[in-house]
Amino acid sequence: MSFFGSNTSLGATSTPAKTTGGLFGSPFGGTAATSQPAPAFGAQATSTPAFGAQPATSAFGAGSAFGATAAAPAFGAATGTSAFGGSAFGSTPAFGAATTTTAGTGLGGGGFGGFGAAPATSQAGLFGAPATSAAPPAFSGFGQQAAASTAPASGFSGFGTTTTSAPAFGGFGTSQSTGFGGGAFGSTFGKPANTTVTPGFGGFGGTSFMLGQPQQQPAPISADEAFAQSILNVSIFGDERDKIVAKWNYLQATWGTGKMFYSQSAAPVDITPENVMCRFKAIGYSRMPGKDNKLGLVALNFCRELSAVKPHQQQVIQTLHSLFGSKPNMLVHIDSIKELENKKCQIVIYVEEKLQHAPNESKRILATELSNYLNQATLKPQLNNLGVVEALALVLPDEDQLREYLENPPRGVDPRMWRQANSDNPDPTLYIPVPMVGFNDLKWRVKCQEQETDTHALYIKKVESELTELKKRHATATAKILEHKRKLAELSHRILRIIVKQECTRKVGTSLTPEEEALRTKLQNMLAVVSAPTQFKGRLSELLSQMRMQRNQFAANGGAEYALDKEAEDEMKTFLTMQQRAMEVLSDTVNKDLRALDVIIKGLPELRQS
């Protein structure tokens, strides 16, 4: 049983049985018999009934609307003209137009569209233009196909335009499109407005229960397939322009930026430098990352600039110390600080723990243990407040990790080029290949090299300052050594004189020993040689005479006279000899340092290039 007396479901076609009367006339949607007495609601009648029959004049307005001649209806009866120029909700009205409307009885007529009924209306246009219109019901009905027609719109429609009427409220699932001014006030001024009405749910009893007409959706494809189609299978225009778009997509892929369009129904493909066709790629070599785990080095990456973090290093140390429980035996140290890309910086720390059994000794906490402790979920909020985004343990990769890295090429790098880079590695134990994809990676590598060069320059300046300091200390030490040598010689001479006097005093009146006798003989021979006129004594006498003559000349000219005793002369000779030796030692030291500096200067460019 249906809701309204038929044996079919909603929206199905059926022929209801005729009845002789009832409370509201015939069943809903049926045709009332004219031979029966006029019912109270919705039936046709030949005489004036009490309620709902065909009267001579309508209930609202004796004549037709705005001067048109028509028979006025009651509520739901068959009429010639509605109360306001047409039916209540379902037909297409016109001001002053002669309209003939055929309405069903009850709720199956034009009042609310009926369930399954399709009323038809024949009317004249606004200014005499002939038209034939199928007026849909007001609420479009459940399961009813909305009829499309071509007629001038009523009321406020355009002049001679063509429109398609649609349900007043669209119904469930109907879609209606008009031009500018369509809908309630007609179509576009002077332009035809095309309207397409599609039942959304297809009615109760239809074959479709979906929003709109079901369409076949294309199967989703992967990003790699979309990238390949955007170069090899462009189908946007269907002509030779697709080849031009494909070439443009290929050009964008080679430089690694842009968007590639390949279909009207698919989204464009974003291009990144990691794609396989990007030409701006290279492979360099970097030192093996990380250090020994026992050193305990952990890198803290900050999302702030270096200038904002560097002045607050002590605050960072205090905050980290509080995270470790503020233990007195835990000491936090900063190993280095450097700038990263995208306005970030990195601080490398390590933590020392003093041993309880040996307070003067300490050990470093392992880098992996320190990193795992800082990456706990309970400490993340405090680190985020400090500006730390991640904590990484700077440890050397193990053999498995290194093998996996070398055997699997990075995304967008040709495997053959990656294998060739592995084979060309100058020192596999110290360096690893690193890809440079795009200009951002190249810029970052150049920046890292500049920072490393600055570090080397600072180290060289430090070495130069240390060498200068060592030279000063060496000169001072050399002068002190010479001074000590001079004092040692003086003391040696004094000791020798004391020993001679002591021996002379001790051996007074005793005979000479055979050794002393041999020594005396040698000394006498030496004295005879020196005292010979043609030997050293004669030369010395000649030199002394010349010196006296020169002294006399200086005295005659008013020069100052001077005289040196023998001891002063000996001391002067000794001092001059020491000065000569000191100058020789200093000259040798300077020559050695100059040779060392030449080696450093020649090796500096090679160090910078490496």
UniProtKB/Swiss-Prot annotation:
Residue ranges crossing the lipid bilayer per the database entry: none
Role summary: Component of the nuclear pore complex (NPC), a complex required for the trafficking across the nuclear envelope. Essential for the nuclear import of nuclear localization signal (NLS)-containing proteins in an importin alpha/importin beta-dependent manner. Together with Nup58, required for transposable element silencing regulation in ovarian follicle cells. By interacting with the nuclear (Nxf1/Nxt1) and cytosolic (fs(1)Yb) components of the flamenco (flam) transcripts processing pathway, enables export and subsequent piRNA production.
Cellular localisation: Nucleus, Nuclear pore complex
Family listed: Belongs to the NUP54 family.
Record Pfam families: Nup54, Nup54_C
Domain notes: Contains FG repeats. FG repeats are interaction sites for karyopherins (importins, exportins) and form probably an affinity gradient, guiding the transport proteins unidirectionally with their cargo through the NPC. FG repeat regions are highly flexible and lack ordered secondary structure. The overall conservation of FG repeats regarding exact sequence, spacing, and repeat unit length is limited.
Annotated Sequence repeat ranges: 4-5, 24-25, 28-29, 41-42, 51-52, 60-61, 66-67, 75-76, 84-85, 89-90, 95-96, 112-113, 115-116, 127-128, 142-143, 159-160, 169-170, 172-173, 180-181, 185-186, 189-190, 201-202, 204-205, 237-238, 324-325
Region (25 X 2 AA repeats of F-G): 4-554
Main location: nucleus
Cystine residue pairs: none
Gene giving rise to this polypeptide: Nup54
Name assigned to this protein: Probable nucleoporin Nup54
Lineage, broadest ranks: Eukaryota, Metazoa, Ecdysozoa, Arthropoda, Hexapoda
Single GO molecular function: structural constituent of nuclear pore
